[in-house]
């Protein structure tokens, strides 16, 4: 029983340390990375460049990435500044 409790505790600690996020990649201008006219592997390559596990061109024609580190900027409706002055 003690080993089981220890295993569960370690499992939660690992989960807290290895935090990843999913979302749309954002450029310096605050806009999502467009993939409308890009090759099929463009988003997967861009996502791997920022240490994401995988990515694809979503219906909004923007790159969506999975399992990226927390330091990567992602698009958020609340903080959207695309098309606005800096």
Swiss-Prot record:
GO terms for molecular function: sodium channel inhibitor activity; toxin activity. GO terms for cellular component: extracellular region. The keyword ATP-binding does not apply. CDD domains: neurotoxins_LC_scorpion (cd23106). Expressed by the venom gland. Pfam families: Toxin_3. Residues 21-83 form the LCN-type CS-alpha/beta domain. Belongs to the long (4 C-C) scorpion toxin superfamily. Sodium channel inhibitor family. Beta subfamily. Has the structural arrangement of an alpha-helix connected to antiparallel beta-sheets by disulfide bonds (CS-alpha/beta). This is Beta-toxin Tz1. It comes from Tityus zulianus (Venezuelan scorpion).
């Amino acid at each position: 029983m003690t080993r089981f409790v220890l295993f569960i505790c370690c499992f939660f600690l690992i989960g807290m340390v290895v935090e990843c996020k999913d979302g749309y990649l954002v450029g310096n201008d605050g806009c999502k990375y467009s993939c409308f006219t890009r090759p099929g592997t463009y988003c997967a390559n861009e996502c791997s460049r920022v240490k994401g596990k995988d990515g694809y061109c979503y219906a909004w024609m923007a790159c969506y990435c999975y399992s990226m580190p927390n330091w990567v900027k992602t698009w958020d409706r609340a903080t959207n500044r695309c098309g606005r002055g800096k």
